[in-house]
Structure formats: C-alpha cells, structure tokens
Amino acid sequence: MLLLWLYQALPTSLTRILLTAGLCVPCALVIHGIYNLYFHPLRNVPGPKLGALTDLYAFYWNWIRGVGYSKQFDRWHKHYNSSVIRIGPNDVHTTQVELYDVIHKAGSTWLKDKSFYKHFGGLDAMIDPREYRTYRTHLAPLYSQRAVDGLVSKMDDDLAICGQKTTKMAENGKAVNMARVLTTLSTSMILYNLFSMDISLWECNDYHPFLEAFEHIMAQIWLFLSYPRLATCLSLIPGTSLARLAPSWTTFMNSCAAWCDEDARKQRASDDQSIRDSHSKRYYALKHTDANDKKSIIPAPLDELFSFIAGGTDTTAYTTGCAFFYILSSPSVCRKLVKELDENASFIRNGLDYHKIQTLPYLNAVIKETLRISVPVPGCLPRVVPEGGITVGSFHLPAGTALSITQQAISLNQDIFPSPLCFSPERWIGPAAAGLDKWNVAFGRGSRQCIGTTLAYLELRCVVAYFFSRFDMTLTAKNGDGHRWVDRFVAVNLDTVEVLVLSDRWSGARY
C-alpha cells in the first residue's frame, strides 16, 4: 500500500529513485551480512555472530550499554574455548600473548588499522610509518628524560597547590575528590608542554570549566570516535544528556583556540630564546623554515590538542587515582610504602629530588602493579596482518585482518601474573620479578610506544610519594567495595576516588 501511494503521489522520476533506494539498500545490507557470516575469510573463527555481522555490535557495548566491548572478550574466549575470537567483520582478538612481541617489535610491518583510527587525531592516529617518525621526531625532545627532569619544578609547584587545597578541605571536614584533583594536575602538566605560556587551572575554587567540559566530551567519546556526524546531530536535541555535548565542545575548543592565539601572539612579540620550549613553539618555528615535508605532516597546535590532552590527562589521572584506591585498600601495602617514604622524606618534603625518588624500590613496585591491574587503555588497538597472513592457533588470518591483543589479555593473564586480580607490588621485587618487566605494557612497546611515558612516570611517582609521605588518609564510602571501571577508549572509574584526610604528618595537624 505504501509503495502504491508513493507511486501515485510523487513524480515518476522521484518515485523510481525512492523505490530503487528502498529496495537496493536493504538488499545490499542483507547480501553484505550473508557474506560476513558465511563467505568471509574469517567465517570459521569462533565468536559472537552479531560481532561477525556488523561493527555496530561493538558500538552497542561501548556506547549504548556503556560498559565497554573489551570487557566481554574474556568470557567469549572461555565460552568458545578458543584463544582466537572474531569480534568484528574483519576484527580478531587473541590471548596468545607471545604475538605481542611479533606485532610491536622494532621495524614491524604490522600497521595500525586505518578503519579504527580514522576519526582519531594527533600522533597516535598516524598510520604511515614515515609520517609518524617525522612527527614523533619533531616532538620527542619535549618528552625526553632530560626534558622531563626539567619539569620537576613545575611538578613541585603544582603539588604544593594540591597540598594547600587538600589541607583546606581537611580543615573544613570535607572529603577530597582525588579524581578531580589528579585530573587538574595531569592536565596542568600536559598544557605546560603544549604551550609556552603558563595556563593556570587551579584558580577555580571547585573544578575548572575547561575540565568539566572535557569530562562531558569524554563521557561520549565512543560516539565521537565511531559516528562523529551522528554525535553532532544528537547534541542538538534539547532536554537530553547529549544536549550538553555542543556547549561542552564549544567551551573546550574556544579555550584551546584562545590559548593558541595568545601563545602565538606572545611568541611573535618575544625573542625566541626567551620562550619556553613547547608544541606551540616548535610548530611556529617550523613555519619559518623551508622544511616543506615536515609542514605537510605536522598539524597546527589546535588540531592536535584534544588527542594530547586526552592521552596525557585521563590515563595518568585514572592510574594515579587507582593507586590511591589500591594502596588505601591494602593496609600492609600502605604501611610498607609509608615506611619507605618516611625513610627518604628529605628529598620529598624539602623539594622533590626526582633522581632519588625514581630509585625507591617499593614505590616503583606499587606504580608498576597499579599500571598492571588498572589497565589504563583496556580496549583494542588493532594492527593489520601484513602480506602473507599469519596462523594463530588453528586459524589462518589473511593479510588485511585487524588483530588485537588487549592490555587486559596480558596484564590479567594468570599464567604471567598469578592471582591477577590481587594487588601485590611484591611480585615486582626480587627473584619473583624476573622477566615481568617484559609484560609491563601499559604504555605499549616498540616504535609506537606512548611518547609521554617518561612524563607519566614522573607524575605517578611524585604524586604518590608526595601524598603518602605527607598525609594519613582513608577512603570514603563513595569508593565502593571494589575497583569498578568502564572502557571509554581509556579506562574510567565508575566510583569517585574520594579520601578523608586524617592528619598532615608534615605539620602535625590532625583533622
């Protein structure tokens, strides 16, 4: 009846177009679905049929259910009794962790999956190895050990502000939302590298509007990464949670644009030698050279800000928050850590001496164990099988297949880490630690390892050392009974990491 009405009501040419589209699109989808299920080269790889049928199944778990597709893999491996499962039409996940070295070794021909990273930005989204090397080499001096050593005074200043805000909250009998404190701290550090001018996020009594906007955006990150145009349309619907996306994105981008403009203005007005090194300085210096090859590859600061802020803020702040949760949930761990910090208080309390802090064995063990158990980037980071294909288990994966080995598959593997859900820094100390560093993969490995690894370790070590050297703390009821998180490309805590400060051991004050 509907087709008949359309035929009578609409002009002949328009009717034919609509009828053709109405018939061809569903037919094409059905044919494509049949191919994926019964004729695709991966048809014999076990896994959920809906995953084999369409990528929408991953989107369902990531955004609609909001728990994370990657959190389902372990039960599917067990259900299908297979170390290899098909998780998408052209995507496979494996728990054969020995392949991690094959994929990430120096000179690897396993490229990043273009279809997965197409809506990402910044350094991590670059597929071409030559372009990636050019961009990374351009930025690498900002993240070298020498450069990070130069950030210790900035870290010291920010921690002093954290300490002041923490004692003020304690004096007023209020709990401290460590998630927000740590997010502010991590963002402050990455902005210091992004811009040559100083940007203060500590001026607000509560939470900086820029960070609040960023938090709203990250809550919908799977929608942005999967279907950015749909995200734009849905954000225009009033009265929904998504309606906050548009103003949040506007706040975020307006702040970034204003900082870029102000930084550029100051650089034009100042002598080059007086300007602190940063992403921004390096980009504007590049504009006045003949390095056309670099110019065509390296994006403007505004285009890379979101990816660097997301990568440099959420992962580090989340991991540090997890450290607080696990340390305060483990009295014996807390006692051992505090004892070590007390014995070395002179280079924590009287200004941070990072060269000495980074040598503390139990602190390092706590950091490594936190990185392992918290799994800061829990989901797929797929690589494309190179020419010739590869056999994994009893399945041949042809060239072009997207293969993933998630951090969870390694960090929570009980053959590598016995009792993987138990927080045990001792596993990283002494004879028991032999060979474990190989599986410390929180920042990746090889040429595509996270460029901010050294900076992240600075933050993790210094924050934990400072707070647990200075304050006696306890978790509040808001933390729940266990560590609960969701996969929003980076892991996000479901429960607020909130602490009550019992005393300031440096001043002797009790609250």
Curated annotation (Swiss-Prot):
The record lists the membrane-crossing segments as: 17-37
Q: Which residues bind heme?
A: C450
> Where does this chain mainly localize?
membrane
Q: How does it sit in the membrane?
A: Single-pass membrane protein
Q: Which UniProt keywords apply?
A: Glycoprotein, Heme, Iron, Membrane, Metal-binding, Transmembrane, Transmembrane helix
Disulfide-bond pairs as recorded? none
What does the entry list under GO cellular component? membrane
Q: Which residues are modified by glycosylation?
A: N81, N344
Compartments (UniProt record):
Membrane
**GO molecular-function annotation terms?**
heme binding; iron ion binding; monooxygenase activity; oxidoreductase activity, acting on paired donors, with incorporation or reduction of molecular oxygen
Name its GO BP terms in alphabetical order. biosynthetic process
Q: Which cofactor does it need?
A: heme
An example of a Pfam family matching this protein is p450
Gene3D superfamilies named among the record's database cross-references = Cytochrome P450
PANTHER family cross-referenced by the UniProt entry? CYTOCHROME P450, CYTOCHROME P450 MONOOXYGENASE ASQL-RELATED
Note, other: Even when expressed, does not show any monooxygenase activity.
The job of this chain, per UniProt, is described as: Inactive cytochrome P450 monooxygenase; part of the gene cluster that mediates the biosynthesis of fungal ergot alkaloid. DmaW catalyzes the first step of ergot alkaloid biosynthesis by condensing dimethylallyl diphosphate (DMAP) and tryptophan to form 4-dimethylallyl-L-tryptophan. The second step is catalyzed by the methyltransferase easF that methylates 4-dimethylallyl-L-tryptophan in the presence of S-adenosyl-L-methionine, resulting in the formation of 4-dimethylallyl-L-abrine.
Q: Which family does this protein fall into?
A: Belongs to the cytochrome P450 family.
Name it. Answer: Inactive cytochrome P450 monooxygenase cloA
Protein species of origin: Claviceps fusiformis (Ergot fungus)
